Design a protein with these regions (language model features):
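Positively charged, low-complexity intrinsically disordered leader regions
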Residues: 1-17
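Short, charged beta->alpha transition segments
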Residues: 3-6, 76-89, 109-122
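Short, glycine-rich nucleotide/cofactor-binding loops
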Residues: 18-28, 141
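Short beta-strand segments
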Residues: 19-20, 48, 127-131
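Short, highly selective alpha-helical patches that border small-molecule cofactor pockets
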Residues: 26-30, 34, 82, 86, ...
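Short acidic, glycine/serine/threonine-rich loops at helix termini
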Residues: 29-30, 56-61, 136-140
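Glycine-rich nucleotide/cofactor/substrate-binding loop typically near the N-terminus or early
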Residues: 35-39, 44-101
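Internal, conserved structured core segments that host functional sites
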Residues: 101-149
């Protein structure tokens, strides 16, 4: 069996923040994990670094560089992967809230994640990437200290 370090962390976690790391449609690559974690009884919150014009939507601005959307959110632009996903999730009878992080730089992104951690209190954060713009193992030495579960 392949030993994936994140697997043991996710097994112990009850609440997980699953986030697209590179933006755009990256969050979609995490959907198999989302459904597996939900089937295991976990609470899973979704977030994504967004390339959409999130402030031009009816989503709720809840923190620094952070907008909460759901299937009832409206937008005047067609490119909004998170909104399409929220509507699809609602059609699947799944929770449809997605947290969109504006791509404004490292400090606002870190502040958005801090806000999400303070308000959602996840036991684990899992970043997913659909390409190669993020190659990390999760225990990389340059990452901030993480909580052991």
């Amino acid at each position: 069996m392949i030993g994936i370090p994140a697997a043991s962390i996710l097994e112990k976690a009850e609440t997980i923040l699953l986030a697209g790391a590179g933006g755009g449609y990256d969050l979609y690559t995490g959907l198999p994990l989302y459904f597996a974690l939900r089937a295991a009884g976990k609470t899973v919150h979704l977030a994504n670094l967004s390339f959409a014009t999130i402030y031009a939507s009816t989503g709720k601005r809840i923190g620094p560089a952070l907008v909460e959307i759901n299937a009832r959110t409206t937008a005047n632009h067609a490119y909004f992967p998170e909104l399409h996903l929220a509507k699809w999730l609602k059609d699947q009878n799944e929770p449809d809230t997605i947290y969109c992080i504006d791509r404004t730089g490292a400090a606002p992104t870190a502040a958005a994640y801090k806000y999400l951690c303070e308000h959602l209190n996840p036991d684990a954060i899992l970043l997913v990437d659909g390409g190669t713009d993020s190659l990390m193992r999760g225990d990389d030495p340059c990452l901030a200290p993480h909580r052991k579960i």
